[in-house]
Amino acid sequence: MNNNFFNSDFDSILRRMMQDMQNSNQTSNKKYYINGKEVSPEELAQFTQQGGNHSAEQSAQAFQQAALRQQGQQSGNGNYLEQIGRNLTQEARDGLLDPVIGRDKEIQETAEVLSRRTKNNPILVGEAGVGKTAIVEGLAQAIVEGNVPAAIKDKEIISIDISSLEAGTQYRGAFEENIQKLVEGVKSSQNAVLFFDEIHQIIGSGATGSDSGSKGLSDILKPALSRGEISIIGATTQDEYRNNIMKDAALTRRFNEVLVNEPSAKDTVEILKGIREKFETHHQVKLPDDVLKACVDLSIQYIPQRLLPDKAIDVLDITAAHLSAQSPAIDKVTTEKRISELEHDKRKAVSAEEYKKADDIQKEIKSLQDKLENSNGEHTAVATVHDISDTIQRLTGIPVSQMDANDIERLKNISSRLRSKIIGQDKAVEMVSRAIRRNRAGFDDGNRPIGSFLFVGPTGVGKTELAKQLAIDLFGNKEALIRLDMSEYSDTTAVSKMIGTTAGYVGYDDNSNTLTEKVRRNPYSVILFDEIEKANPQILTLLLQVMDDGNLTDGQGNVINFKNTIIICTSNAGFGNGNDTEEKDIMHEMKKFFRPEFLNRFNGIVEFLHLDKDALQDIVNLLLDDVQVTLDKKGITMDVSQDAKDWLIEEGYDEELGARPLRRIVEQQVRDKITDYYLDHTDVKHVDIDVEDNELVVKGK
């Protein structure tokens, strides 16, 4: 690079400066700066000598490297480890680490690998949240307690942040210099074990990716790892281990894999009991045993996309923080720390003879001490199972507290609640209710969706409405209904709308609108496949796996859990003729449209019958109730005569089309006429609807 600043004139200026330095007797009082950095005369002389023979960039790099070497020699390699890492063993001695419960096997395996003569580098492999970092902390505690092989009883585990190695390395060679200092620090200490969390980041870290010869962190460490000169503990996930570490065979063989699985529910409860005291001290909240068990049980049931113990600990922490924020209890730890700070300030004020300030500080100390004495733990909040349910509800949107409070009674009455909304389809409602009661009461195998049903019947008889009411009754709102119109899934590429595209196709990284992604975000939902007979056969093939195994693999290889969903398929393929058709006759008719293995996966095939006029009497009441809900927003009450209701039924009854014509009549004859009347009488508070001359009439008050 050509830089006019570093030319012969600049060299002459530097030579003149050097002559002044030699001729002056007051050199010690002069200061010299290069690029804003103060340097000694010797460093300036070295820079001048190199700058005269090299380009500006090379001179700057040489000076930077010399400064780094000098800094490393001054600070020492041991201090460098302290600068960029945390000594977990020392933290264990100081009692700063949480206890590790139920991981003795993994800790023992890690200790055995570390005690090897060569290739003594364990790598903890497990999914996110299973406690890989906690195992390393447990190993540090085991070293302090002496419960490890003799070969590693004096080891110090240093947790290294990879980003700290890269920080400030703007010149070529600076990163390699940091790595060499790190390696030399480990060699000189003779008892240091490095811990890299997210160790897959060492692949390519520090490499320039060009032909300049700059090496990455993993390339520099390989020789030392194979000879056993340094020992490293790594932690990473299964995917990152496969996609990064295993691609480098030379690096893989230098590590020994220690598999970390998700702990059982029983072990997780014991883990929570082990860390309970620290959470109680931090939040000033009591956490009984039943609360710990509820954290585990509810997190397993309602947060299936995450793993234990991480999700259970999060639920416990969030609940305690929520109660602590609402509790008037004094934070004892913070208050005592504040009193200690004030005592120090008071002593300084007395030393400075600022007695008025010291007196004010003493009054504040007395006030805080009185608060501590008066609290005595009597206002300490106590967590309950209901608080855990509220936390799950805030995290997932599922009304867990409502479902748990009186779940048995709700299960008993589910059929009556659905019958009040779905008119004339008692047989269908009862079949659906039985399947849901069986699943929710715990008498199902648990490896399939809550229920899978095929609703068959003519249009307008309540098939879709029953799915909506199920979503409201079970999950609290209509948003829990995922509705897919199968007329949009009739082409051969429709599978990509369900599970996303596979690698190599457009949209592989964008699966936000697929069914699998929606279920992953909302695992508790009702999935409605409307008019299933229009779907492409590949869609039906996918549903076989969902209804049989309760899971589905998306285009990116992620397994999505469908075990907390209700699957409903609807079809109007020639059924619902008003007769009491036997189930075997229904199966015979449906085999004309669907394969037997598809029909055989459903919990029930439900026939919806034609609606008669008696059923429409209840339906018109429901539709008018919806109108009243709208009028309530305007502060208007409504009274509809029986003659008006009979007139609506007569005008809206169509046996073939079901209840939809009645809905249109109510829309046109009731809502529209009330709207017209309101626009002419904006102060109206009550309306009466009756029949005059075979027409509906709206009168207001």
Swiss-Prot record:
Residue stretches of biased makeup (Low complexity): 56-74
Residues where ATP binds: 126-133, 457-464
Record flagged with keyword ATP-binding: yes
Positions of the UniProt region annotated as II: 383-575
Region listing for Disordered, in residue ranges: 46-78
Domain of life: Bacteria
Domain UVR positions: 336-371
Entry keyword set: ATP-binding, Chaperone, Nucleotide-binding
UniProt GO BP: cellular response to heat
Gene3D superfamilies referenced in this protein's UniProt entry, alphabetically: 1.10.8.60, P-loop containing nucleotide triphosphate hydrolases, UVR domain
Spans annotated as I: 81-332
Biased composition (Polar residues): 46-55
GO CC field: cytoplasm
Example of a GO MF term: ATP binding
Record's function text: Required for the development of induced thermotolerance.
Protein family membership: Belongs to the ClpA/ClpB family. ClpL subfamily.
Protein's name according to its UniProt entry: ATP-dependent Clp protease ATP-binding subunit ClpL
Organism of this sequence: Staphylococcus aureus (strain MRSA252)
Gene that encodes it: clpL
